[in-house]
């Protein structure tokens, strides 16, 4: 059963009446451009056909009752009072979004009953949290008929995750969930928020392979990477590493390395990764899948060696995928790191070969069974 059907059904069972409306917000997979978003850089994700559905109805007071179907928990809070953190981690994503919507739209106090469910695997690097934030943001916008654009909802979602949940994420996940386009990957300039859609190449599939090693970005590694990038930006005297050219980096690399080895390595990844994203857009436009595969491999190597966010299980999955796919296509880790998934652009005729090579080898080597998803690029958040 699809999340949107399950949300509608469980809403009726839980509240004893039918939901008025349902919102669906997709997860995302990032083809290339990792950790560049919070450095004001470039990313190239697409929204995927896995996501979060929220069924909801207005109440005649200012209370939100939120039923999390997948874990059978409920949260309740009053929009006429200051919104405080909950002991339930999932509930803070909901409360945080509503809190920052109220900062922008102080008149918003419309109560509601909500039931929500997701088929995005948790802690997989496919943005289950952004799908939750954007679905809640859109729900609030509809409930209050609020004058919020999709980009504004995305930035409110990011604000909630940064300030209320405590993960210093960039804005890519939320922007993709809000603004994704069917059959397109979208290059996002994370400073200007300009979007360049590029069609998914004909004859290719997007495969996502979950290592089933879970990650949790609220822990310190992600935030320390961000601090190291900020150190490097201060060293170069710029607002963000987006503003450092490759030439300027090379000129002062030895000096930065002497001051702070980790900041040097992190900056090397970000500056080279931004360049790879720009080249990837051109490769896709030219249908040059050999070049795109090389860029994806370069991105993975940089995440492994300079940003140091991969783990042995992920590196092994990428190696297997690269062998299976060959030169026409590519594979790399996707998401924040320390587990999660790899993404592959794979010729349609090689999908089963890829699936088989990984099934035959990954569990044997690691003791963990992978999960294989074929995805399509889909539209961003919408009312169903």
UniProtKB/Swiss-Prot annotation:
The record marks 28 as: Transition state stabilizer. It is found in: Cytoplasm. It comes from the Bacteria. SUPFAM superfamilies: GHMP Kinase, C-terminal domain, Ribosomal protein S5 domain 2-like. The keyword Transferase applies. Keywords: ATP-binding, Carbohydrate metabolism, Cytoplasm, Galactose metabolism, Kinase, Magnesium, Metal-binding, Nucleotide-binding, Transferase. Belongs to the GHMP kinase family. GalK subfamily. This is Galactokinase. It comes from Actinobacillus pleuropneumoniae serotype 7 (strain AP76). The gene is galK.
């Amino acid at each position: 059963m699809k999340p949107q059907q399950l949300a509608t059904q469980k809403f009726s069972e839980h509240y004893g009446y039918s939901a008025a409306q349902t919102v669906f917000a997709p997860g995302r997979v990032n083809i290339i451009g990792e950790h560049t978003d919070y450095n004001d850089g470039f990313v190239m994700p697409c929204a995927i056909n896995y996501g979060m559905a929220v069924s909801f109805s207005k109440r005649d007071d200012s209370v939100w009752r939120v039923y999390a179907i997948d874990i059978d928990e409920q949260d309740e809070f009053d929009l006429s009072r200051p919104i405080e953190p909950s002991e339930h981690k999932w509930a803070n994503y909901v409360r945080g979004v509503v809190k920052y919507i109220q900062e922008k739209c102080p008149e918003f106090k419309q109560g509601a009953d909500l039931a929500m469910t997701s088929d995005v695997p948790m802690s997989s690097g496919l943005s289950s949290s952004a799908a939750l934030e954007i679905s809640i943001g859109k729900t609030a916008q509809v409930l209050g008929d609020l004058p919020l654009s999709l980009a504004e909802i995305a930035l409110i979602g990011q604000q909630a995750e940064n300030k209320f949940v405590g993960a210093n994420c960039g804005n890519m996940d939320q922007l993709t969930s809000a603004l994704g386009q069917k059959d397109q990957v979208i290059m996002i300039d994370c400073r200007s928020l300009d979007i360049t859609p590029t069609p998914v190449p004909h004859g290719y599939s997007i495969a996502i392979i979950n290592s089933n090693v879970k990650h949790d970005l609220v822990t310190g590694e992600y935030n320390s990477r961000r601090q190291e990038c900020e150190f490097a930006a201060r060293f170069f005297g710029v607002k963000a590493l987006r503003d450092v050219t490759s030439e300027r980096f090379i000129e002062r690399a030895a000096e930065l390395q002497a001051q702070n080895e980790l900041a040097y390595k992190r900056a090397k990844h970000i500056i080279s990764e931004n360049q790879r994203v720009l080249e990837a857009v051109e490769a896709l436009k030219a249908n040059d899948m050999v070049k795109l595969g090389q860029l994806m491999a370069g991105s993975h190597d940089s995440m492994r060696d300079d940003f140091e966010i991969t783990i042995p299980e992920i590196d092994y999955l990428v190696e297997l995928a690269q062998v299976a796919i060959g030169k026409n296509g590519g594979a790399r880790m996707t998401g924040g790191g320390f587990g999660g998934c790899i993404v592959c652009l794979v010729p349609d005729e090689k999908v089963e070969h890829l699936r088989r090579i990984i099934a035959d080898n990954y569990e044997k080597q690691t003791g963990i069974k992978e999960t294989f998803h074929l995805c399509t690029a889909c539209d961003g958040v919408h009312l169903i």
